[in-house]
């Protein structure tokens, strides 16, 4: 009842990625049914775009974030250090990074799942992007660019985590991916219903 009547947009964004990991078949079936019902609800597209855009702006305005990394104390890092004097890019939180890809995917699912219920089936970004493409919501090129950037970022992130490093790379290391993701982000956020 809460998810249908009172939940915030960000809670529905999180539901796009949610999946049951433990429970009886009956319980996991109920969860999947509720998740699908919430995701497939028809929404005010302009309000959705405003909510997602405002959420992302708040994240970017937050100049520092707290991150815990294995074997390291709590440290503060800029979300986008390339805007400071340090030429670094946060592959997760920086503009054109993983969060932007996730927000793009979540926005498209929440915007179109009432028409294409298969968009509510998967909870991982790669298969959701494939579904968005197969339903004509993403072009082949946009889907390809998002998947490639997401896979590149994840691979790079795993390598950094194995070295107990924060998810920061030199700003010039991911410029192609960043440009492609920010271009798609701009298109999605400018779409009005």
Task: Show the residue positions of the predicted features.
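A nucleotide- and high-energy phosphate-metabolite-utilizing enzyme signature
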Residues: 1-193
């Amino acid at each position: 009842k809460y998810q249908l009547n009172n939940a915030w947009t960000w809670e529905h964004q999180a539901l796009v990625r949610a999946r049951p990991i433990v429970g009886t078949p009956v319980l996991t079936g109920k969860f999947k049914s509720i998740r699908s019902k919430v995701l497939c609800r028809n929404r005010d597209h302009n309000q959705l775009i405003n909510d997602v855009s405002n959420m992302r702006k708040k994240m970017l305005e937050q100049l520092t974030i707290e991150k815990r990394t294995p074997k390291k104390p709590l440290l503060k890092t800029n979300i986008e250090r390339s805007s400071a004097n340090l030429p670094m890019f946060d592959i997760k939180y920086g503009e054109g990074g993983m969060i932007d890809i996730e927000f793009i995917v979540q926005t498209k699912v929440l915007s179109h799942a009432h028409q294409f219920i298969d968009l509510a089936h998967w909870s991982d970004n790669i298969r959701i992007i494939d579904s968005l493409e197969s339903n004509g919501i993403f072009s082949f090129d946009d889907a390809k660019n998002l998947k490639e950037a997401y896979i590149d970022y994840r691979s790079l992130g795993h390598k950094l985590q194995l070295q107990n490093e924060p998810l920061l790379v030199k700003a010039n290391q991911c410029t192609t991916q960043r440009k492609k993701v920010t271009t798609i982000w701009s298109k999605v956020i400018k779409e009005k219903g």
